[in-house]
């Protein structure tokens, strides 16, 4: 029987299986798995003799990771899922959510409270803690627009810190936490959510979906339902077909280079970049043009619905999925001269 140490504030497991803790359902094992119930006890838990001094790997819901090998680190999971309104103001509210809360649960809860802002981010897998690391985004919205404070344990300084949105250094699918992965352990996030705001409807089929639902004056909850419908049609359910959502980031190119590429490929979708001098390309389009959509090699494959999504049909290993991803990226580079990189975090391997 594997060793398990239980306290009211945390639980430490030895030789813990991770298959049910990652949405690729990769069979992997953690030498130590630490589950944090009350984050205030985190410093004490980290000094336990079995794990003191070990590097830490935070695993939320495992929805954005590929376990290419057994992690050497102590795997840490926050299981604090409480959510509360800290204060109400005339036009917004401050909301605090525990790092272990499922992101979609927070979206639904905020809508039930009459708050808005997160509706375009409905049904994104993962936890509240992970949302700030990845700066999750969808349908024209990024979470950085609503983050007020991130509460984290700074392993370098040995203390809890409260970082403002600007201090989080958010960028496209990036943040301070992603650039310093071994420093901060996010315990909770505070959000500044408006009571009313201008809905973003002009992105990727939302207006058409609302029309199909016969909604002419949409409210935030209607937008959330439209997004849920769209995502369910486009992306496979990880509980049915194991996956980690979009595996690759959309690449950014200098505007001139993007336009030159479209001259050779007139149907190439191009979107505004983060600056007037850059454009964002559709990684899904590039991959599909290389013939990868729906491909299956053993139990590793690319989803038939969406070329950005790698899938595990059953017993694929993390190494097999990583090898497939590398071949996909190499083919895009060879045909289009464009480098695509993983959005999914690689554990036990480098890109």
Swiss-Prot record:
Residues annotated as signal peptide: none
Gene3D superfamilies referenced in this protein's UniProt entry, alphabetically: 3.30.465.10, UDP-N-acetylenolpyruvoylglucosamine reductase, C-terminal domain, Uridine Diphospho-n-acetylenolpyruvylglucosamine Reductase, domain 2
SUPFAM superfamilies hit by this protein: FAD-binding/transporter-associated domain-like, Uridine diphospho-N-Acetylenolpyruvylglucosamine reductase, MurB, C-terminal domain
Cofactor(s) listed: FAD
GO terms, biological process: cell division; cell wall organization; peptidoglycan biosynthetic process; regulation of cell shape
GO molecular function annotations of the record: FAD binding; UDP-N-acetylmuramate dehydrogenase activity
Location of the FAD-binding PCMH-type domain: 25-196
Key word Iron present: no
UniProt xrefs under InterPro entries: FAD-bd_PCMH, FAD-bd_PCMH-like_sf, FAD-bd_PCMH_sub1, FAD-bd_PCMH_sub2, MurB, MurB_C, MurB_C_sf, Oxid_FAD_bind_N
Pfam families recorded: FAD_binding_4, MurB_C
Family: Belongs to the MurB family.
Stated name of the protein: UDP-N-acetylenolpyruvoylglucosamine reductase
Organism name: Xylella fastidiosa (strain 9a5c)
Lineage of the organism: Bacteria, Pseudomonadati, Pseudomonadota, Gammaproteobacteria, Lysobacterales
